[in-house]
């Protein structure tokens, strides 16, 4: 048992996992599909953060990275019982913005409950469905979205990482 886990047990604290979701990242879409099951299966406290694209030199050819990530997600999704259609293009900015505003308005539990549905509608390019989900779950203003993403980016940077679709637990990163 690692030192951090020993401290957690001694203090009778739950396992705490932090999840970093980059809305238009294909891997975040795959992760979104397992979050609810993951949090239900294990006795964990799950904190969810919205983040922006990798900062600085962490993704020097960002468009190429996203093209390859879409292809990779398409190729592996079915093998894990997940879904990801063959997307040659990134989602349109208007559907990204709606999805992000919905997710930014959620607390952790609501985020876990709705992220897969919101992500599916966004990757399907279904603006009408996203607007219905916005009415159902609520949405944040663009200023609130910026603040939520800034908090997520700050936490991710504090933990010394740069990517989305990442889980952080007991001092270690998992993808």
What are these regions (language model features)?
Residues 1-3:
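Conserved small/polar residues in nucleotide/adenosyl-binding loops
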Residues 6-8:
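Low-complexity, charge- and small-residue-enriched intrinsically disordered regions
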Residues 10-17:
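A short, charged/proline- and glycine-enriched loop
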Residues 23, 29-122:
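Structural alpha/beta surface segment adjacent to cysteine/selenocysteine redox centers
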Residues 31-38, 115-175:
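C-terminal cap of thioredoxin/glutaredoxin-like
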């Amino acid at each position: 048992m690692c030192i951090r886990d020993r401290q957690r047990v001694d203090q009778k604290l739950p396992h705490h996992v932090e999840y970093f979701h980059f809305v238009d990242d294909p891997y975040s879409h795959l992760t979104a599909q397992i979050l609810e099951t993951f949090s239900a299966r294990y006795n964990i406290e799950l904190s969810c953060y919205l983040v922006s694209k990798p900062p600085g030199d962490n993704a020097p050819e960002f468009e190429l990275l996203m093209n390859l990530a879409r292809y990779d997600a398409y190729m592996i999704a079915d093998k894990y019982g997940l879904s990801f259609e063959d997307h040659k293009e990134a989602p349109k900015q208007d559907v990204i913005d709606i999805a992000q505003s919905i997710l930014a308005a959620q607390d952790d539990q609501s985020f876990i409950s709705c992220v897969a549905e919101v992500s599916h509608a966004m990757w399907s390019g279904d603006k009408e469905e996203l607007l219905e989900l916005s009415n159902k779950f609520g949405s944040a203003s663009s200023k609130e979205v910026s603040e939520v993403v800034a908090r997520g980016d700050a936490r991710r940077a504090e933990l010394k990482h740069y990517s989305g679709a990442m889980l952080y637990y007991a001092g270690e990163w998992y993808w």
